[in-house]
UniProtKB/Swiss-Prot annotation:
Protein name per Swiss-Prot or TrEMBL: Periplasmic nitrate reductase
Pfam family, one: Molybdopterin
Record gene name: napA
Keyword Methyltransferase appears in the UniProt entry: no
Chain sites annotated for binding Mo-bis(molybdopterin guanine dinucleotide): 87, 154, 179, 183, 216-223, 247-251, 266-268, 377, 381, 487, 513-514, 536, 563, 723-732, 807, 824
Lineage of the organism: Bacteria, Pseudomonadati, Pseudomonadota, Alphaproteobacteria, Hyphomicrobiales
Organism whose genome encodes this protein: Agrobacterium fabrum (strain C58 / ATCC 33970) (Agrobacterium tumefaciens (strain C58))
EC code: 1.9.6.1
Modifications the protein undergoes after translation, according to the UniProt entry: Predicted to be exported by the Tat system. The position of the signal peptide cleavage has not been experimentally proven.
Amino acid sequence: MSSELTRRNLLKAHAAGIAAATAGIALPAAAQPVPGGVSALQIKWSKAPCRFCGTGCGVMVGVKEGKVVATHGDMQAEVNRGLNCIKGYFLSKIMYGKDRLETPLLRKKNGVYAKDGEFEPVSWDEAFDVMAQQCKRVLKEKGPTAVGMFGSGQWTIFEGYAATKLMRAGFRSNNLDPNARHCMASAAYAFMRTFGMDEPMGCYDDFEHADAFVLWGSNMAEMHPILWTRIADRRLGFDHVRVAVLSTFTHRSMDLADIPMVFKPGTDLVILNYIANHIIKTGRVNEDFVRNHTKFVRGVTDIGYGLRPDDPVEVNAANSADPTKTEAIDFETFKEFVSEYTLEKTAAMTGVEAGFLEELAELYADPKRKVMSLWTMGFNQHVRGVWANQMVYNIHLLTGKISEPGNSPFSLTGQPSACGTAREVGTFAHRLPADMTVTNPEHRKHAEEIWRIPHGIIPEKPGYHAVQQDRMLHDGKLNFYWVQVNNNVQAGPNTKNETYLGYRNPENFIVVSDAYPTITAMSADLILPAAMWVEKEGAYGNAERRTHVWHQLVEASGEARSDLWQLVEFSKRFTTDEVWPAEILDANPAYRGKTLYEVLYKDSDVGKFPLSEINADYKNQESSDFGFYLQKGLFEEYAAFGRGHGHDLAPYDAYHEVRGMRWPVVDGKETLWRYREGYDPYVKPGEGVKFYGNKDGRAVIIAVPYEPPAESPDQEFDTWLVTGRVLEHWHSGSMTMRVPELYKAFPGARCFMNADDARKRGLNQGAEIRIVSRRGEIRSRVETRGRNRMPPGVIFVPWFDASQLINKVTLDATDPISKQTDFKKCAVKIEPVA
């Protein structure tokens, strides 16, 4: 090889890459074209999924002299086809912030732990000794219900699986929940209530087949920009394709919209029922499909808003005790139910032009038009989020536009493994792997058999969900708490009155594992430095059911260790005698005296794969420390839950050779569309369509009404507050705000406001203001000219900025079914800063 990468060679390599991609041939990383001249030849390139959102883009990661020095879009990745968004282009910088945590930090006073002490560096042994002492104290004094963990949709699959074993099988506590409770819980519950199985039936290939795209509360242009390019390509390349965008304000996705619709907050429920009514009234119901593949139910109403039980709103709610209850009805009853949602009534309630409403309804009603519905936080962060999700399924089921190329109700995901880890692994307070639940005795028994632990170990009662965890910390009922891969003191709702006070409650011991000193970390008693992204071997599952695995490419900074290493290493400090009931141990004496490390990891199926099976070209810190191929063992044991049950995963080693596969993977073949014959191996010849998650093979169409938000503007608090993200930053900004280019692009949050509203208050562009709610206040600055154009009476404030904690202001109302927080609707007032 010559010492220089010449222009001709670069062009030849580029042409080869394009040809190979077109032919579906995977080139080795070294053969992929990269810029950089001679230095590029000294860089080792390996594949990985992007660290940020749930799209699951593939990237090539360049390592030189033990550091990640560059990344570029992976041309062999089907998801993004070589593209990255602005965040993805700067992935190489997220691990190298100047304030990276490199050693455990414990609050101390006079050389010993003290809740009111200052952080001091300690060894891992001292950190775990104090941590174990506090955990054992709480277990002894109050039992398993006082121990909890808050995890993440950014956990790798291995980390989430190790955590669910430690909490449920080790400490016998279901107080395990992910921050995905804040983003995907409503979607997951709606999938289960409608189809009996979680996650989308379609895939990203639908983008190239659909004739219409309808965005419900999703600003894809900024939040899922790579997928947005596929919509834009389809819309601009074919004259018949239409795009409808529904939102409470005008944003960048509206720029491509043929049907732009700004509705009053919460009234999307009205629009959904109107569309169902329109389909029925105009005679466009797919009667054969509905007759053979669906059933109808009516949901209970007046279900409350997930506030504290003593809140007057909850006390007055008629059915807050059982919000999931339904009763069977027939099509005629459903028809009568939605008939009141006329065009005129819908236009009046929502504020949307009647013409736009009718155009939207026609997209769904036209039997010749394939429709892809897409949604994310606008639907999910909603006090009736489960209903909203189910109501869009109503529309697709009434028309039969589902489970085939281009006809796809598609729930987009916010985090890189909210699907793969939070949902598929089952790190929610009520779930087990592969859609199993702790409340089902057969599911618990099955899990105990796979885990090779005695029956009766896994508790049957669901644990505290995310918002409830904050309340229980505040009330002193949850006293040992471990937080990994999230920043909930910044990200959670009503943080001033619930979250922060719970962390600083003297009765509680709080541990936070993180890579940077976030607000959450600085609110803790013990901070554990965490390895990031390619500093460990990992696996994510994206929004289209694609599981993607990567190797460890570099070593972690300082003494930082992965969350997986922390979980498994910590388990060594507990014996079964300290955490399991005596009666279970008496009946199973072989478990006595063993550590949780031995029972859950080393001596289980997890520990059976030797180090020799690790690719010799890559390091694996955790496996080297424990003496066996930890990640492979965890994955294969976890995969046993789903194989043969419609959640089939390929053998672990296969994932290292591809850019992910979409489950179910049967006989080495991934599944693009579920529930339809010819695509899904679980649908037998002659069955056509079968929603096999439900025993009768039928999907559910539900009749539920519009109900108002938990809090609406009044004379004093006269403005709606909506929170969310911006293109340049991700979540709380703990990574992206440390990338100089991203920081400069959007250095601080702004209050996006209607210009007339600002003028009426005497506020100019850039004026400093106070945003005040019944719960708290922050300061921000007015933005009337930016990318978001607000209607009168609505403001938008992104939550990435730690200097503007907008969640001090938000309301901790949740969907009573999913327990997911509504960050999109609360009442505030705007005051100038004198």
